[in-house]
């Protein structure tokens, strides 16, 4: 099943411009050591300036031994909050809260507004919330690459749901990433998503109320800039994806559309009876896969059933 790409004519130029604008912003990285630190792991609250000079934060956990370390950028689900990941004792982790998420609401606070409506302006896609969120992820890679205790040649990215889509976008837009693990991903094949999922039919009227002159074609054209299916062929690192065939939040067809557009080393794990969730068994499988890509025997993760 191959889904036709929906790239606008200026798609590549659009993203090159966003990256250039990000590069012009001084990141002003700041780190504050947290009392969550242990003998094995240092935990830091990190802060940085991103696209549009928006302040974002995350939690950086790094082993206290055997530097330099490989690193994993962990990305959040839709409007969720990321917290420190202290169990991976053989790799550093940056759990990022992009703009509008968790502790990154100084400059972008959705409050009662639907997050994905922020900056929805058909004439100015560069102002859309996901233009900034995608760049926030690249800024996080900048942070990891800047750290002397990190081996910048061993940085991977992971996430689930929205985080899975963000992981794919990060791998597409930043060649420093050496693997991408995307579970039950969102943000791909927007047309398929809006046709198959209740969100579209519930929210199209709200978009038309905000933009009375908008058309279905206009919505699809706008969202095509932020479609990971259209970015997939830019990914050069290995990709692990998973999907649950009973998922009624991120329709499986959209994940297949992205996967089939990939032109790199790729693996897809399909769970026939699961929905919009990631099983503990898959988490363990993914951690083993990521450890291998990072060149370590194990990430050191201890699962609840093993405590």
Where are the regions that the model predicts?
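C-terminal catalytic histidine-bearing segment of alpha/beta-hydrolase fold enzymes
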Residues: 256-307
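Short beta-strand/loop motif that positions the catalytic acidic residue
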Residues: 234-235, 241-243, 247
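Short beta-strand element of the alpha/beta-hydrolase
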Residues: 58-63, 67-78
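Hydrolase active-site cap/lid region
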Residues: 168-214, 270, 278
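Gly/Ser-rich "nucleophile elbow"/oxyanion-hole loop immediately N-terminal to the catalytic nucleophile
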Residues: 118-161
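N-terminal targeting or regulatory segments adjacent to alpha/beta-hydrolase or S9 domains
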Residues: 1-42, 299-307
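Acidic catalytic loop of the alpha/beta-hydrolase fold
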Residues: 245-250, 276-277
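Cap/lid segment of the alpha/beta-hydrolase catalytic domain
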Residues: 83-85, 92-135, 192-195, 199-201
